[in-house]
Design a protein with these regions (language model features):
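Glycine-rich phosphate-binding loops that contact phosphosugars or nucleotide phosphates
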Residues: 44-188, 208, 275-299
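Short helix-capping/linker segments at secondary-structure and domain boundaries
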Residues: 33-34, 73, 164-174, 238-239, ...
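Active-site phosphate/pyrophosphate-binding segments
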Residues: 13-20, 27, 35, 39, ...
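Short, small/acidic-rich helices and loops at N termini and domain boundaries
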Residues: 337-350
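C-terminal active-site/capping subdomain that shapes the small-molecule cofactor and substrate pocket
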Residues: 255-340
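Polybasic, low-complexity association/targeting segments
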Residues: 1-16
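A generic structural motif
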Residues: 79-80, 240-252, 299-308
């Protein structure tokens, strides 16, 4: 497929995943505004926060935890499993249960745990059993409208949480920083959208480099969850193998595992997501780690996050990755939306 022939993308992209990616900046802004308006009852003092969810419904919490890591004064963890950890108990614990469909069994398990343990709880979803049970239990529900895959609703999963934390008084108003971020995203988007030719489109060129390779995404600091997002987008959108690694931890193990089996070395591709706002030593580590990979014969590249703030850099790196994963899917002649193995597993689990 010629990536310059963007009018033919719809022959592969039968459910228009491209539209969802194009709309991410607007979705992020819409979600924050919605979250500032939805009903929120008064809450008791909070000493810990747990966000329970899976997949595309959990990544927004990952992103928020990373974004706020330098300013949030209470512990905030993302829980991807069934029963909540033992410390999630009592009125001083806030449990946020997020499920796009409202039927995710792990999220439902976490919700029931939270109610049993007397936690303050709020539900974020489009519908399903989760909202039904929340309404019966008298738990606040933040319902949003979105038709599509959970991974395409990352603006909602992040933006609603950003508004929630603002309204709880955990962080200052984010309106100005969000407006700046949307501007950065819009300017980036103008350079990487589908109608921009390959010669001028760095996202399309990057996708071309990934074809036939096993992709490893490296990041550090607050960009670590963006590396996870790149990995999961490659899995779900391009139906391709990918892993993510976090610096500095990867320098204490992964770096030693790049030699064997020797015949696979040249099938690897290491992508480094850089931030000018990261810890100076991590910036050095990212550069040195990339050098070592190159010396071992592994192809590498990097993306420098755009903007001057953590929020802008977080989201610009995410948006660029979403476009790269999409163009990779097109080059693989793969529909970006359907995920048959995941659907099959869910059906098997409910049989």
């Amino acid at each position: 497929m010629d990536l310059d022939d963007h009018k033919r993308f719809s022959h592969i992209d039968t459910e228009n995943m491209l539209k969802h990616i194009d709309q991410l900046p607007a979705q992020l802004n819409e979600a924050y505004q919605l979250g500032m308006e939805l009903e929120l009852p008064a809450m008791k003092p909070i000493t810990r926060i747990v966000s329970a969810g899976m997949g595309g419904s959990a990544i927004g919490a990952d992103l928020l935890a990373a974004y706020l890591s330098d300013r949030l004064s209470v512990p905030f963890i993302v829980h991807r499993d069934y029963n909540l950890p033992a410390f999630a108990a009592g009125k001083d614990t806030l449990v946020i249960v997020s499920s796009h469909s409202g039927n995710t069994e792990e999220a439902l398990s976490g919700f029931r745990n939270a109610i049993e343990r007397g936690c303050q709880t709020i539900v974020i979803s489009t519908g399903g059993k989760l909202i039904e049970e929340a309404l019966k239990a008298g738990v606040p529900v933040w319902k949003f409208a979105h038709i599509g895959q959970p991974r395409a609703a990352v603006g909602f999963s992040f933006g609603l949480l950003l508004a929630l934390f603002t309204r709880l008084g955990l962080i200052p108003d984010q309106s100005a920083e969000l407006a700046n971020t949307i501007d950065v995203l819009n300017r980036l988007q103008e350079r990487i959208k589908a109608d921009v030719p390959v010669l001028k489109n760095s996202a399309k060129r990057q996708a071309g480099q990934f074809i036939g390779r096993n992709v490893m995404i490296f990041a550090s600091g607050f960009l670590a969850p963006v590396a996870r997002r790149w990995k999961t987008q490659f899995n779900e959108v391009a139906k391709a193998f990918a892993v993510f690694e976090v610096i500095p931890e990867a320098d204490h193990n992964t770096l030693a595992g790049i030699c064997n089996p020797p015949q696979q070395v040249f099938q690897q591709y290491a992508m480094f997501l850089n931030s000018s706002l990261d810890h100076p030593r991590n910036q050095v580590r990212m550069a040195k780690t990339r050098e070592i990979f190159m010396l071992e014969g592994i192809a590498t590249d990097s993306f420098n996050a755009k903007g001057d703030t953590r929020l802008a850099q977080l989201w610009s790196a995410l948006l660029f990755g979403d476009y790269v994963a999409y163009y990779t899917a097109i080059l693989y002649d793969t529909d970006p939306t359907p995920i048959p193995p995941i659907v099959a597993l869910k059906e098997a689990m409910t049989a």
